[in-house]
């Protein structure tokens, strides 16, 4: 690798030998091709996706769907399994609200690790509080992290119960940098316990094959892997997706208003999660 050639792709450090950016795990710098792409959009392609039949809009809609296919290939998933969001935080909140609000009953349990990133923990705390305000009480069960920075799978095993519905996991820990053995954890879980995986720190560094991982939900952001801010990905298995309901609604939500009763007409994840104008 030629470090200087790589630096030239990033305007913030190009030609400035004194600048070394060490916070890419939080937010990566934006390379020239991405900046050029954004500039091109605003200069010559700006239109609304999936809203119109004129050539500029249909061309842009085709680009969005092409990007969806590429993300699906990146994860070894089907394009119908992929939704674009505003980032990993939004993806994780969509899991909590679109799945959790419509599938959890009194006494059900969600397993979380309080040492995970707040964006992987707070959506479940918020879900618990929201359900409580509607008269439904769920329980959050905290499991331990080893001093080495990996999950204590024995503690997870000991705290599983017949009421456990989902476990929230990080693929690579945001503080300790340890890759979690998702397959090992998955092996001790009953088949009916779902896995919501935060892949924010792994997507840009290691191969993610959702078929091998077996996670039911996978979330990550673009801003940690050289994309623009405000871009995120949510993956969901088809069979889980069919139990979800939109947490937000608007244009592009696959609703049919049948005698004042809303019905979903598609289980495509984008039809459930994406609404309004995309970033």
Where do the language-model regions lie?
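Pyridoxal 5′-phosphate
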Residues: 1-279
């Amino acid at each position: 690798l030629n470090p200087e050639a790589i630096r030239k792709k990033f305007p913030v450090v190009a030609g400035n030998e004194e600048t070394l950016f060490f916070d890419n795990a939080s937010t990566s710098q934006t390379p020239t091709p991405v900046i050029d792409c954004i500039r091109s959009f605003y200069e010559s392609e700006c239109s609304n996706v999936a809203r119109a039949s004129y050539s500029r809009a249909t061309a842009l809609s085709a680009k969005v769907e092409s990007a969806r296919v590429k993300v699906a290939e990146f994860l070894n998933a089907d394009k119908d399994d992929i939704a674009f969001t505003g980032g990993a935080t939004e993806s994780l909140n969509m899991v909590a609200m679109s799945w959790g609000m419509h599938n959890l009953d009194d006494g059900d349990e969600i397993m979380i690790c309080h040492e995970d990133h707040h964006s992987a923990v707070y959506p479940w705390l918020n879900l618990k509080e929201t359900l409580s305000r509607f008269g439904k009480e769920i329980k959050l069960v905290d499991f331990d992290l080893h001093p080495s920075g990996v999950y204590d799978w024995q503690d997870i095993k000991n705290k599983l119960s017949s009421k456990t519905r989902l476990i929230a996991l990080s693929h690579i820990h945001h503080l300790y940098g340890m890759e979690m053995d998702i397959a090992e954890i998955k092996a001790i879980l009953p088949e009916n316990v779902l896995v919501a995986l935060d892949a924010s720190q792994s997507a840009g560094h290691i191969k993610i094959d959702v078929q091998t991982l077996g996670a039911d939900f996978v979330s990550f952001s673009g801003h940690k892997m050289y994309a623009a801010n405000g871009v995120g990905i949510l993956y969901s298995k088809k069979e889980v997706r069919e139990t979800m309901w939109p947490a937000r609604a608007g244009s592009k939500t696959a609703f049919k208003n049948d005698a004042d009763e809303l019905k979903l007409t598609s289980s495509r994840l984008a039809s459930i999660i994406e609404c309004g104008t995309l970033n």
